[in-house]
Amino acid sequence: MNSICDPGDEVIIPEPFYANYNGFALASDVNVIPITSKIDDNFALPSIHEFEKKINSKTKAILLCNPCNPTGYVYSQEEITNIANLAKKNDLFIVVDEVYREFIYTDTKHFSILEDEKFSENAILIDSISKRYSLCGARVGFI
């Protein structure tokens, strides 16, 4: 978060979310602005209007986990595209944690933010080798 945020900046994250996001934000003095997804909607992304209400001058990014940890919900191409368009329109980063993209147990197809080149200037993809190669506990970063 330090590479895209200054102390006091904000990152919008749909909740429930991976608990360590709070720790990462706290370590960077960044404020997490939660936006609640609901079990009644199978944890789909809230409406764009709900995100728009959270954006202000301190907002620097929207962070998604796709598939979502802990809900397992896989965001659709439409959901990813809509939220990425909102980020682009507001000159925000769209940070997408795709660590679990190979762990989908339905017919739902995973759509990566990087599949659409128009978002490349705003997109940051988070990935890990620990899940894919069964290297749990390995703390290896790569760019």
Locate predicted features.
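Phosphate-binding glycine-rich loop
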Residues: 1-10
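Hydrophobic/aromatic ligand-binding patch that stacks against planar heteroaromatic rings
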Residues: 3, 23-25, 86
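A short helix->loop->beta-strand "cap" motif at the edges of active sites that frequently abuts
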Residues: 9, 30, 89-93, 119-121
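Short beta->alpha connector loops at strand-helix junctions that form conserved
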Residues: 15, 34-39
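A short helix-loop-beta submotif of the ANL/AMP-binding
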Residues: 26-33
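Active-site phosphate-binding strand-loop segment of PLP-dependent enzymes
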Residues: 38-109
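Active-site PLP attachment segment
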Residues: 115-143
